[in-house]
């Protein structure tokens, strides 16, 4: 039971992190209008690429934990 609660807790934290990353991505895109040099554009491009990669990894972790939670719940109910 403790493992299930731990997985649910981490799943919720992962969802919160995804929301924060989406907000960060929007803020970075809003600052794209203030770019003056190519170096600024390169920094923004790298930052956006890193946030997108992190979002993909967090979504994968979320799906794995969600599957684990569902599996544990089915085992407990049977």
Swiss-Prot record:
One of its GO terms (cellular component) is host cell membrane. The chain crosses the membrane at residues 58-78. It comes from the Viruses. Residues 1-23 form the signal peptide. Keywords: Host membrane, Membrane, Signal, Transmembrane, Transmembrane helix. Residues 24-57 are lumenal. It is found in: Host membrane. It is a single-pass membrane protein. Coiled coil: none annotated. InterPro entries: Corona_7 (IPR003449). Residues 54-65 are annotated as: Interaction with PPP1CC/PP1-gamma. Belongs to the coronaviruses ns7/ns7a protein family. Inhibits the integrated stress response (ISR) in the infected cell by promoting EIF2S1/eIF-2alpha dephosphorylation. Acts as a functional homolog of host PPP1R15A/GADD34 to recruit PP1 phosphatase and dephosphorylate host EIF2S1/eIF-2alpha. May function in the formation of membrane-bound replication complexes or in the assembly of the virus. Interacts with serine/threonine-protein phosphatase PPP1CC/PP1-gamma; this interaction; this interaction probably promotes EIF2S1/eIF-2alpha dephosphorylation. This is Non-structural protein 7. It comes from Porcine transmissible gastroenteritis coronavirus (strain FS772/70) (TGEV). The lineage of its organism: Viruses, Riboviria, Orthornavirae, Pisuviricota, Pisoniviricetes.
